[in-house]
Amino acid sequence: AESTLYQQRRTILTPLPKTGIHRLQAAHDVWDAIGSHVSTMTPEAHDATFAAVSHLPHMLAFAAVNALMSQPQGAAFLDMAGPGFRDFSRIAASDASVWRDILSANQTEVLAQVAHFRVALDQFEAALKQGDAAALQHLIQQASDVRSAWTLQAGNACNKASEN
């Protein structure tokens, strides 16, 4: 155990309607005392949020590696992969049984995020098929701007010493 494990880390409490205010405050106080940044959201908001920022990205990493390796030249492609693929696919090495359970338990929200992703991917595909370099650049720039602004925000995961 490491005493600083939860310091400066986000902890989200997801109280149920039957959760008493005193119990919720006690849980908040414990996490706060060990240095965690504590917030509260409904279980439904939690499931939607983490389907978007955790569950879908894991599924995409699994799918990207599987898609690569399903091709006859997949192993050769992998031999040539660099830091971009390494960074993108890092989470594909996650425990399969843990992620099977997470994705299954949050199926509805994950499928909603898959639909959103499919729309975004279709936009890229359409721009490529149409040879629309301006649309392609716009889609890339839009994502780049959001990602850059997010990394500058105080308190987000990218501003921590390590991104675990």
Where are these regions (language model features)?
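Rossmann-fold dinucleotide-binding core
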Residues: A1-V38, D47-F50
